[in-house]
């Protein structure tokens, strides 16, 4: 009697799964194989997809090899021009316009390796999208589809005539025919959709699949009239104190003020914990900084408790921290749910190196909060436009800049650059500085500040781009509301669109981390 067959020797494994960061290089290689005449994804594009909408990025893996993939984002399609381009709908491929509350999934690419195009890989990827649309209760899936065989007929018929013949099955088009077979219906034909697509003569068919399981919400989720975020900026006075408890009392007072105003964020200045030097009685600046690092746990414990107690997210200024024998200038985000994040200062001023021996960090971070994505760029860092652009591309809508400057010239560098970053990146920026003086403390003798909240410059925002600002050089707070929904709409339809209109064909910023 023959032995029972070992069926595992015959098995082949096909998996449709979400894309992970380890797959990115393989996805780029796959695109080169699928579309040899078109510019492939850049790594930063695919990383941005995973940061903004990881659930919408799928790949087909066969025997350990990635042989197909698809990418998508969520939008409210009513907010876009019918004659949009691929660049418009994807924010130049970065999908930073992804709207988690959107009613429509927009598919921006599907590709299958040429060797595997008889295995219904495209159909499987489309089904994964449809399953996700049902799970998220989306109204429809919309795609801008290529018509890659049109160039063969372009001299004898218009794009509309070609599409009509494909729809009537008189001409076969590998993309449009496939989409029709998968339940998509034609909405319109868009010219100049994808400049690199010479096979389609730059045309695309706008197609839609309607989710028959969609349940309309009682509220009109597709139109969000406002997304207000209230920010309380503390312009903190540096004056002599006699204990950490006295410092804690002052801090709690301001957090209480922010909470009473129902603020979403309370923002403290850079290295305002150097106020502790006033009772440490250490004359050497470098030794005084080392003494301050001994209060790191007390500082973190204090702000964590206050964020939870007063139900407000706190940008805890910044604090000197010793790690592995080096001292860093670190800004902390204390979320009101009790979690903590940190951002190292990346650019160290000559003064910080000379007096305190501060070391530089090496990562630009963007943090999720209950009020959207934010970034923190400490003082000098806001003077380097590359960092703000990287943060904006990672999805940040607000950049907080705690600062500490001793004179008006230093302050104006921070202010002017902060306002410039707001315009360049169509984001809100916030600066919070120290005032007063510490006469017996080396290198912290005098302070100058006028803190503020800044917006882009367009009709939807404050006339002069200033949401609110303090009076110069006195201890006080300023409280202002910023609207992330207005910001989102302005990025799509503003008088100018700095993010969309970048010339990526002649320059780009590469983040090396």
Swiss-Prot record:
Effect of gene knockout: No visible growth phenotype.
Domain N-acetyltransferase: 14-212
SUPFAM superfamilies: Acyl-CoA N-acyltransferases (Nat) (SSF55729), Carbon-nitrogen hydrolase (SSF56317)
Entry superkingdom: Bacteria
EC code(s) of this entry: 3.5.-.-
Enzyme class: hydrolase
Record carries keyword Hydrolase: yes
GO MF terms held by the record: acyltransferase activity, transferring groups other than amino-acyl groups; hydrolase activity
InterPro entries xrefs: Acyl_CoA_acyltransferase (IPR016181), C-N_Hydrolase (IPR003010), C-N_Hydrolase_sf (IPR036526), GNAT_dom (IPR000182), UPF0012_CS (IPR001110)
Cross-referenced PROSITE patterns: CN_HYDROLASE, GNAT, UPF0012
Keywords of the record: Hydrolase
Xref: Pfam families: Acetyltransf_1, CN_hydrolase
Domain named CN hydrolase: residues: 229-484
Active site (UniProt): 270 (proton acceptor), 345 (proton donor), 379 (nucleophile)
Family, similarity comment: Belongs to the carbon-nitrogen hydrolase superfamily. NIT1/NIT2 family.
Protein name (database record): Probable hydrolase YhcX
């Amino acid at each position: 009697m023959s032995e029972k067959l070992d069926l595992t020797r015959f098995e082949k494994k096909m998996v449709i799964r979400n894309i992970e960061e380890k797959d990115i290089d393989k996805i780029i290689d796959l695109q080169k194989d699928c579309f040899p005449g078109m510019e492939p994804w850049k790594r930063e594009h695919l990383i941005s997809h995973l940061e903004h909408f990881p659930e919408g990025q799928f790949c087909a893996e066969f025997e350990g090899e990635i042989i197909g993939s698809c990418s998508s984002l969520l939008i409210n399609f009513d907010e876009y021009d019918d004659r949009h381009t691929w660049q418009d709908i994807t924010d130049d491929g970065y999908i930073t316009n992804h709207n988690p509350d959107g009613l429509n999934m927009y598919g921006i690419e599907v590709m299958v390796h040429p060797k595997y195009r008889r295995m219904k890989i495209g159909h499987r990827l489309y089904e994964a999208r449809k399953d996700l649309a049902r799970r998220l209760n989306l109204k429809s899936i919309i795609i801008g589809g290529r018509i890659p065989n049109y160039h063969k007929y372009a001299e004898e018929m218009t794009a509309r005539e070609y599409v009509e013949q494909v729809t009537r099955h008189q001409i076969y088009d590998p993309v449009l025919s496939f989409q029709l077979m998968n339940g998509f219906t034609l909405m319109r034909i868009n010219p100049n959709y994808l400049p690199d697509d010479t096979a389609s003569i730059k045309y695309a068919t706008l197609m839609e699949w309607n989710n028959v399981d969609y349940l309309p919400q009682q509220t009109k989720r597709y139109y969000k009239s406002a997304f207000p975020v209230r920010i309380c900026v503390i312009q903190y006075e540096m004056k002599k104190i006699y204990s950490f408890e006295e410092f804690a009392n002052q801090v709690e007072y301001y957090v209480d003020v922010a909470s009473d105003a129902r603020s979403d964020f309370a923002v403290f200045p850079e290295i305002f914990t150097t106020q502790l030097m006033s009772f440490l009685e250490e004359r050497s600046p470098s030794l005084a900084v080392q003494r301050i690092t001994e209060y790191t746990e007390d500082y973190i414990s204090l702000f964590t408790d206050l964020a939870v107690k007063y139900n407000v997210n706190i940008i805890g200024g910044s604090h000197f921290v010793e790690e592995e024998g080096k001292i860093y200038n670190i800004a902390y985000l204390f979320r009101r749910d009790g979690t903590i994040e940190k951002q190292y200062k990346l650019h160290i001023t000559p003064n910080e190196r000379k007096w305190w021996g501060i070391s530089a960090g090496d990562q630009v971070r963007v943090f999720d909060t209950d009020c959207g994505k934010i970034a923190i760029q400490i003082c000098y860092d806001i003077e380097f436009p590359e960092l703000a652009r990287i943060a904006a591309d990672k999805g940040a809508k607000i950049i907080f800049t705690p600062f500490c400057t001793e004179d008006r010239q230093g302050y104006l560098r921070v202010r002017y650059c902060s306002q410039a970053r707001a315009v360049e990146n169509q984001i809100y920026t916030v600066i919070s500085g120290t005032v007063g003086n510490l006469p017996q403390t080396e290198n912290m003798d005098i302070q100058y500040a006028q803190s503020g909240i800044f917006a882009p410059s367009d009709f939807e925002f404050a006339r002069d781009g200033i949401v609110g600002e303090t009076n110069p050089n006195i201890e006080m707070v300023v409280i202002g509301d910023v609207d992330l929904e207005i910001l989102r709409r302005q990025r799509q339809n503003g008088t100018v669109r700095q993010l969309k209109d970048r010339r990526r064909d002649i320059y780009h910023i590469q983040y090396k981390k």
